[in-house]
Amino acid sequence: MSAAAVILFPFIGILLLSQISSYRISSWLNTLFSFLSFVGSLFLLFKKDPPGSFFLVDELNIVFILLTNFIGFTTALFSQRYIAHEIEIGHLSPPSLRFYHSMYQALLFGMNLALCSNNIGLMWVSIEMATLSTVLMVGIYRTTESLEASWKYFILGGVGIALALFGTFLFYISARPTIGEGLAAMAWTNLFSHAAYLDSSLVNIGFIFILIGYGTKVGLFPLHGWLPDAHAEGPTPISAVLSGLLLNVALYAILRFKILLSANPHALQAGPLLTAMGLASVLFAALMFYKRRDIKRLFAYSSIEHMGIISFAFGIGGALANFAGLLHMSMHSLTKSAIFFAIGYISQIKRTQKIADLSGLTSSHPVLGWGLVFGVLAIAGLPPMGVFMSEFLVLSSAFARSPLLAACLAVGLITALGALILKLVQVSFGEPRGDSSPIRSLYLPMFSHFLLVFAAGVYIPPRVVEWFQHCSVLLK
């Protein structure tokens, strides 16, 4: 099974699910196609095809592909009960259900195509496709707030993708004198092998546009404006895949271009730019936590913080920092998506996302309440969770490079920790408020993620360590 499989399954899903209005059948088919994509990604661990004109699979993008398709599958599983409840209470209709499931598969199709692509132009098109899918799903409720969030996402995302397109074009122009015209000058494999000969002035300008353009998709400060609204107003499964997956895909694009700069002796150093944007994102998000009143907005800002940590790590560079960045990306994706699984059911039960109205969850709904406690403690970076391990490694590598930068990052992490604990106490403990009626829930996706995050904090298999170390070398 080749990279084409993880692209083919969601493509078939788009065509089929757009024709099915039964939510029971369509939700199971959505889960089935997502599962098949995940199985296809597992096969890539054991058999990697040689690079072709359009597809490239190496140890680096397999990390992203596997993570994307695992969380894509578990989120589809979570969506079954969540979307069924939205249908039952009249928030969604059968036509919108067809749209939701076909767009969900379009999102997976776009992300997988971007990650498997051996062409800088095809990557750009794929990320734009994935973005448009989520833009449409954010506005699926057709409320004033959701349409406004969707429009804001579309405008800011459009600006970002336009800048990324211009940056991509500059890299293509820089490669033509050495590689030649056409698709050859757009292939990652050719660009990697000729990186030292690319026009450094064009490459430098191009990377600035790439960083700003794709950085908008990552949600880095000050390009984050779309992210809190999109998380708060869209369906919770989309919040989970936005935070857990799509932000990673945009960061992957930045990292691929960063590798090209690292191999060019005359190009600028991309690391300090990425470090600065990452640190600014952490500090900004940490301060904004204290003012949040909506629980989904709170964790949207948490995503800004953690994408900042990941960017900071890759900006610092070196074997340890790159390893820590990959580990933190994996832990954040698993933890944050699981938190949104819990929040999705909680908001349906309580019929609100206001933090002030969600108190006493550990008493009224112990499974969800304590699950949220676990998730918040994990995402806050407390031991023995995997996030603690990755943050410790990021700080260690930063202290070795620049104690001042490490101290600034530590201040941001401690500030964020205090805010999250404060909000956790408000939500999980105290006198229960609001509706406590049970709804049909599926906890397997949430607890499977938490189990992996806990296990990674206790023991990482040597094979995984070796894999991430090889990826760290690719990232230089």
Curated annotation (Swiss-Prot):
Localization terms from the record: Cell inner membrane
Membrane topology note: Multi-pass membrane protein
GO cellular component terms given for this protein: plasma membrane
Its EC number(s): 1.-.-.-
Alphabetized Pfam families for the sequence: Proton_antipo_M
Protein's GO biological process: ATP synthesis coupled electron transport
InterPro entries documented for this protein: ComplexI-like_HydComp (IPR052175), NADH_UbQ_OxRdtase (IPR003918), ND/Mrp_TM (IPR001750)
Record keywords, A-Z: Cell inner membrane, Cell membrane, Membrane, Oxidoreductase, Transmembrane, Transmembrane helix
Subcellular location, principal: membrane
Transmembrane segments annotated in the record for this chain: 1-21, 25-45, 54-74, 120-140, 153-173, 202-222, 235-255, 270-290, 307-327, 368-388, 402-422, 442-462
Top-level division of the source organism's lineage: Bacteria
Gene Ontology MF term list: NADH dehydrogenase (ubiquinone) activity
Family to which this protein belongs: Belongs to the complex I subunit 5 family.
Cited NCBIfam families: PRK06458.1-3, PRK06458.1-5
Protein name according to UniProt: Hydrogenase-4 component F homolog
